[in-house]
């Protein structure tokens, strides 16, 4: 399969805003809160990875009395990813906290309008408005980020990460053996998903939480802060690269637990 390097004239993850927006707090070493009334947690992964990115988060949540389940996205279209997320949500009994990492914020924003969902949690995730796509959130004319160097497009229309640059782009602070394994088992995402728009925005009516990855090299940190402010989220910053579920699973689980114990 022949791959072509992604150029700045195409859809990339550049710097959207040149100014910085304040977050509520900067947090490290959060403490997980044991499960209360809301125990069900639905986890939605991002591009280039599959549901296994949540492995250690799931373990921590289970140990604290939660019932986590991870969605496996097909990533051949946003429409099908929304369907896959809804299928998992439909199997849940009782209230749910819906969690999205990176691209996973797109289906979370759409599916989160379901009455079962009591809160939304975003980790360096897309948080679009109604009628927005990922393309709409990103500025293709701004300077690029280092993680762009890893992104390639296959001739059949999928984004991939160059395995040798996978860690640099997503998780240069995560355990190297885990990152190396994920780089050769990555899941590509169809280019067309970046132009598909959400038709609902659950954060308008649901409580939301947002964890900014302050050392992100593939999604602009300023964009994350902007989205968090736009949706009115309770916001923290984690000193980590893009893939917090890999590098800081304990903090990710703890932040989810804060959301779960804050809703009724």
Predicted features by range, described:
Residues 116-117, 121-163, 190-194:
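Flexible "cap/lid" loop of the alpha/beta hydrolase fold
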Residues 2-13:
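Bacterial N-terminal signal peptides that target proteins for export
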Residues 155-202:
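Conserved alpha/beta-hydrolase catalytic His-Asp/Glu region
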Residues 99-104, 108:
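Gly/Ala-rich beta-loop-alpha elbow adjacent to hydrolase catalytic centers
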Residues 81, 187-231, 235-249, 254:
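Conserved serine/cysteine hydrolase catalytic core
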Residues 12-22:
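Bacterial N-terminal signal peptides
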Residues 36-78:
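Conserved HGGG/HGGXW glycine-rich cap/lid loop of the alpha/beta-hydrolase fold
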